[in-house]
A protein has these predicted regions:
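Bacterial N-terminal signal peptides
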Residues: 8-16
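N-terminal domain-start segments of secreted/luminal proteins
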Residues: 141-180
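Sec/Tat signal peptide C-region and signal peptidase I cleavage site
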Residues: 18-22
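Bacterial N-terminal signal peptides that target proteins for export
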Residues: 1-9
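Beta-strand-enriched, solvent-exposed domains that form extended recognition/catalytic surfaces
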Residues: 23-151
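Extracellular beta-strand-rich solenoid/capping regions of secreted or surface-exposed proteins
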Residues: 117-119, 164-181, 189-205, 211-226, ...
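Right-handed parallel beta-helix
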Residues: 179-181, 186, 200-210, 223-234, ...
Length: 329
């Protein structure tokens, strides 16, 4: 199956500007990982408010916390309108539950081993049962993508739903040229990193994922790079690393890591960086800002972090200035 499963519901939202049809979009799961990546701790379903039928979600197993190497759960879907999320806890009773961030003000209803809550806008949530933050459920409710790139455009690299491995077997990476849009369709799983080296005007978009790459996305000696919507699951090194680059924008990125030196977003000698609406759960620094390191030289300046969740199981949510180029006598 290489298309998104799109559920157009009859529920209508009547607005002053007209009538908008509400939707839920779920992603197919490649057969090659369907059983290997599933977590049985929870059964999660969604539906539009006012509808009868529930839509099943696939519960991904994601590793968190370097000390305990715990198995947490992640689900994703796209939606518009207002939806209910139903969670069944499959291993024991629910004595207490909380939906974070607490600033969202979501008060779940509990009935036996079921939990129910409602959302009406895109969210990145942690649902925690009985005080357990290590075996919790992550709910990523994305906005529906309106402008999908044309897969026949010569400047588009389009990854359809399914498993994709790089032809560069030595580096296990996909190298991206200048003036290119890379689109990861929901359900696309890349088993390799994305390399932007000495390029400009690159976009990496979509609701697909990078699964256990050596590193996630590397941006070096480059300018004007946009990363929007992708999920990086358990890379062995950085989720996104920037070196001596300018004009990097990262939006709606989700990241999990559990190994040493598996930072979230690290920037060495980078400028004009915008980080907005990201979820980083890492076992090293979630965000690190450096000047000189390795072969990167120059200032690190004009970095903005907005509307984001930084969850450092190990190390720091933000680390600034550890490395540099000191004078020697």
């Amino acid at each position: 199956m290489n298309k998104l499963i799109r559920i157009a519901l009859t529920f209508l939202l009547v607005m002053t500007t007209g009538v908008i049809q509400a939707e839920i979009v779920i992603y197919p799961v490649p057969q090659g990982i369907y059983y290997a990546r599933h977590n049985d701790d929870y059964t999660v379903k969604v539906r539009q408010v006012g509808e009868k039928d529930w839509v099943d979600l696939y519960e991904y197993n994601v590793k968190v916390d370097m000390d305990t190497k715990s198995d947490a759960t992640m689900v994703q879907f796209d939606f518009s309108g207002k939806v209910e999320v139903l969670v069944q806890k499959n291993n024991g009773e629910i004595r207490s539950a909380v939906v974070r961030p607490l600033s969202k003000g979501i008060q779940p209803e509990i009935d036996g081993n079921f939990l129910l809550f409602t959302i009406d806008k895109p969210q990145k949530l942690s649902v925690e049962f009985n005080g357990d933050r290590l075996n919790n459920l992550h709910v990523f409710a994305n906005p529906i993508i309106k402008n999908v790139p044309d897969k026949n455009d010569p400047n588009v690299i389009y990854f359809e739903a399914g498993i994709h491995e790089p032809t560069d077997t030595a580096g296990k990476c996909f190298r991206i040229p200048s003036n290119t849009t890379v689109y990861l369709e929901g359900g696309a799983v890349l088993k390799g990193c994305l390399i932007c080296d000495s390029v400009e005007n690159v976009k990496i978009l979509g609701h697909g994922m990078l699964l256990e790459p050596q590193q996630g996305i590397s941006v070096t000696y480059s300018r004007n790079v946009l990363i929007d919507g992708v999920t990086v699951v358990n890379p062995r090194h950085y989720t996104v690393s920037g070196g001596q680059s300018t004009g990097i924008t990262i939006k709606n990125l989700k990241s999990f890591s559990y190994q040493g030196w598996s930072d979230g977003l690290d920037f060495m000698s980078c400028s004009d960086v915008m980080i907005d609406d990201v979820f980083l759960r890492n076992s090293d620094d979630c965000i690190a800002l450096y000047t000189h390191r390795w072969n990167y030289y120059g200032d690190c300046r004009n970095v903005h972090v907005l509307n984001s969740t930084l969850w450092a199981d190990i190390a720091h949510p933000i680390n600034i200035g550890t490395h540099g180029n000191t004078e020697t006598g």
